[in-house]
Amino acid sequence: MRVEQASEATEELLDAIHRLLPQLNAARTPPTLAQLGEVIDTQTLLVARDDETGGVVGVATFVLYRVASGLKGRVEDVIVDTSVRGQGVGETLVRECMARANEAQVLMLELTSMPYRESANRLYKRLGFVRKPTNVYVWWPR
């Protein structure tokens, strides 16, 4: 498996996102090709590909953002295809995000994970992420 940074929105990548996103959250509407292009243009979309087939087996989005307190990083939408879970794809994607965060010299790298995603939570703890004693609040515009 290899990890690469997506440089352009292609139909092949869009199809992969449409296949993977429901595995993370079936309620989310997959992006259009133009929206995927916006993600690629403004964030770092990492793509894990199978060595033999070249097919997309996982993705993660690495986000850098500056606030008054400094530069922070975020990991979003880590999605590993069910057919390859437990084979290190998620770990490789998150480690790549961590390496990029180190290179950018962020104050912290944040991510969230639902409690029922037990394997993912174990992975994040094993990689050195610690649970913050805070509440996460979400507001959805109508």
Residue ranges and their predicted role:
Residues V78-V80, S113:
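Hydrophobic adenine-recognition pocket in adenosine-nucleotide-binding enzymes
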Residues A101-S113:
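Conserved GNAT acetyl-CoA-binding A-motif
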Residues V80, G86-A99, R122, R126:
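Conserved acetyl-CoA-binding loop-helix of GNAT-fold acetyltransferases
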Residues Y65-V67, S83, Y116, R142:
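Short coil/turn motifs at secondary-structure junctions
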Residues E91, P115-P133, V138-W139:
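Conserved active-site alpha-helix within GNAT-family acetyltransferase domains
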Residues R2-G70, E76, V94-R95, R100, ...:
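Acetyl-CoA-dependent GNAT
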